[in-house]
């Protein structure tokens, strides 16, 4: 009745409205449970240690006792942390922390109520002094910084198309006892794995071992890499490392203002290379370790999955047929475009749960797809049209009309272009990695070994725009609303943009060395989000000031893509955690 009176208060006198308001106040004061307003803060606390009375940048992690999902926040400059109620359901949670060099003593749990704010109190951390225990807390970048050796030696380890950290942490390398001779054999074995579709827990053996003599790892001498690794691991009977273990600084300032939620997918072990978000906020991902796509509804935490077609031929005896999906792109109708294996395009309709496939005039298709934004109807992809002639691969770009299903004429990309000339590598090739389109719908892609952005008009006039930094290895990125394509320079530790109206490239230096940026994605405010391979940090660049904010994830992560959820009510970024089979949501809270 009271709600009805209030709703129709425009026909009541002011005096009677005042009486209604007074009645409402009395009801609230009586403490009726059904009318209690839940506190916006579900849990708060502080962090300190024997070394620091106030600890900023400690990642505090909660995990429900009945769920694998992780929810994490980071302590601020006052050592305080808080979890908002809209991200914590009532129930019991395990409490853990991430702060290299420190640990939380004993098991700790907390019960979150339905309405009242809970104060966890002080989390008191103790310093880790045992190097063997500290080693398990280091990121791969921490290991690179700790390893002795010259810049050239560390470049051997990190600056490769595929490096050790792409499938597992460098802790595994550092703890190994392999000699240089044995490590060459390890590299030989790992060369038989399909790197994008594999992790340490999900391995696909797709090629036969190459001869040890003259073995290279993506253009580098395998023997040089092995000899260096044998100087930093536990070979020769060592029980501890003969160098100090170094850790990166903890997050600070704006880097503490995020809530991170980690969703392990149900099918494990899996590999998640790419994802995208539809107009409703659902997260679609390709399972790169198996022939499945999946969907997460973040509102309910519910997962769904569907099997995918695979058009690769059967392999020769003793080898595995590559399975798994890489790129995912969702168009404005929420149709899901999927980079299935083989030489075809494939789309999935969420409404009918059916697949449609389209032929492409290629014998091999690049496992990435160009984005299709609202108002765009061209899906760009590349593929090899005939058997390569040595290093000439006959890679062509094709525009696919997602509305009509028509495939445009192929654009020859590199056959008449000079070969890359990085003096530190052999057997270099011209090829496209990540493709996109300019505001007019014309093709572009990153050409990593040519250290260029390849561009073409509809008539097939191709030009290479070189990066200002030579041999920078441009990797993946995305075009913003101002017709600038943002991309990472993996070897140069830069993020860059090319003005697609003028071809001018602007570079922004990232720190520290070997931060290894992989994917760059602009958000609606003009900030650029960058995934980093090996640091477990997500970066945010402000191009106007050059300021970079770093957010530490609660888990080891390797994200090959960054997606901004434009349907969310706050800046929200999604990451596919390749090697752990997880989806990570990062929400900026301030």
Describe the role of every protein-language-model region.
Residues 160-171:
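The canonical Cys-X-X-Cys-His
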